[in-house]
């Protein structure tokens, strides 16, 4: 496959080699030969080992754990490509770390998502491609074209294959995620409910209030990120207590840090479905009730359209 103005080069960082290889296979292209390694003092060294002059280069790199290492890899790969005369550089970020720091959380705190966007731009990236940003307005943090892909079509197909939609309800695990959950509920034509967590008084435990009648329904919790898993597990408990038949969860990015996998395994969640935007840990891979939806085909299609100067948004029309 060739780009409209030059050949396509796919360069993989170390964040998710399996996903990078699957994307390359989907495009029927090899990964560009490159070395991304550490010196003894843990400084990062990058060497592009083939000619990329005039190419349309795509760096495949999630800024997931360890986020700072993977971010630095991205920046240094970008610099290497820029100094090797790549015509255009697109950063393909299946998971954009620091996205949850998209506003000041208190006095004298940073907006780290904006800082990271600036770093990526200043390093020499011409375009960004990412998946299910934590907040849509983060697209505006970049001063370069940014395509935010959506995992919803993949989830919709999986849900339609698996569930009786007449007995299914989509659930937002918090008030902030209502728009995302409503969008999915509309796509599969099911009702919507909300789990509202709040503290009645300072120092008291959070109370989970279910807004909507979930009795007898198979409930599907929808969100963009699952990290510790605490909110998800507590929401599942609240839904079961209100008479839900079963509780499933469809979450785009499985950060699943610390003991999250064990927490999910021992919870009332029937199944957690995540994408492979983040390389799963051994604990996540072995968890009996965590399943992965592959996103390589979606990203491959988006890369092909970008290289051919075709519409990416039409993938989701």
From Swiss-Prot:
It is an enzyme of class 2 (transferase). It catalyses: D-ribose 5-phosphate + ATP = 5-phospho-alpha-D-ribose 1-diphosphate + AMP + H(+). GO terms for biological process: 5-phosphoribose 1-diphosphate biosynthetic process; purine nucleotide biosynthetic process; ribonucleoside monophosphate biosynthetic process. Its cofactor is Mg(2+). Mg(2+) 2 binds at residue 174. Pathway: Metabolic intermediate biosynthesis; 5-phospho-alpha-D-ribose 1-diphosphate biosynthesis; 5-phospho-alpha-D-ribose 1-diphosphate from D-ribose 5-phosphate (route I): step 1/1. Its main location: cytoplasm. It holds the Pfam family Pribosyl_synth. GO terms for cellular component: cytoplasm; ribose phosphate diphosphokinase complex. ATP binds at residues 41-43, 100-101. One of its GO terms (molecular function) is kinase activity. Binds 2 Mg(2+) ions per subunit. D-ribose 5-phosphate binds at residues 199, 223, 227-231. Keywords: ATP-binding, Cytoplasm, Kinase, Magnesium, Metal-binding, Nucleotide biosynthesis, Nucleotide-binding, Transferase. It is found in: Cytoplasm. Homohexamer. Belongs to the ribose-phosphate pyrophosphokinase family. Class I subfamily. PANTHER family: RIBOSE-PHOSPHATE DIPHOSPHOKINASE FAMILY MEMBER, RIBOSE-PHOSPHATE PYROPHOSPHOKINASE 1, CHLOROPLASTIC. This is Ribose-phosphate pyrophosphokinase. It comes from Bradyrhizobium diazoefficiens (strain JCM 10833 / BCRC 13528 / IAM 13628 / NBRC 14792 / USDA 110).
């Amino acid at each position: 496959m060739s780009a409209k103005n030059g050949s396509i080069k796919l360069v993989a960082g170390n964040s998710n080699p399996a996903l990078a290889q699957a994307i390359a296979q989907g495009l029927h292209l090899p990964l560009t030969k490159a070395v991304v390694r550490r010196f003894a003092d843990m400084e990062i060294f990058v060497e592009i080992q083939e000619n990329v002059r005039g190419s349309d280069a795509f760096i495949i790199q999630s800024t997931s754990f360890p986020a700072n290492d993977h971010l630095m890899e991205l920046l240094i790969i970008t610099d290497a490509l820029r100094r090797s005369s790549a015509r255009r550089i697109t950063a393909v970020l299946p998971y954009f770390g620091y996205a949850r720091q998209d506003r000041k959380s208190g006095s004298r705190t940073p907006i780290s998502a904006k800082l990271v966007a600036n770093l990526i731009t200043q390093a020499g990236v011409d375009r960004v491609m990412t998946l299910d940003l934590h907040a849509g307005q983060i697209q505006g943090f970049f001063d370069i074209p940014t395509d935010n892909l959506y995992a919803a079509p993949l989830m919709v197909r999986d849900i339609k294959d698996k569930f009786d939609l007449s007995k299914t309800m989509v659930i937002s695990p918090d008030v902030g995620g209502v728009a995302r959950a409503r969008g999915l509920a509309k796509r599969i034509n099911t009702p919507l409910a909300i789990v509202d967590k709040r503290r009645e008084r300072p120092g008291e435990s959070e109370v989970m209030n279910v807004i909507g009648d979930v009795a007898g329904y198979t409930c599907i919790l929808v969100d963009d990120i699952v990290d510790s898993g605490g909110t998800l597990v507590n929401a599942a408990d609240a839904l079961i207590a209100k008479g839900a038949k079963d509780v499933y969860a469809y979450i785009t990015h499985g950060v699943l840090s610390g003991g999250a996998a064990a927490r999910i395994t021992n919870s009332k969640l029937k199944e957690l479905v995540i994408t492979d935007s983040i390389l799963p840990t051994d604990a996540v891979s072995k968890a009996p009730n965590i399943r992965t939806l592959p996103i390589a085909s979606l990203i491959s299609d988006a890369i092909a359209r970008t290289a051919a100067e075709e519409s990416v948004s039409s993938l989701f029309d």
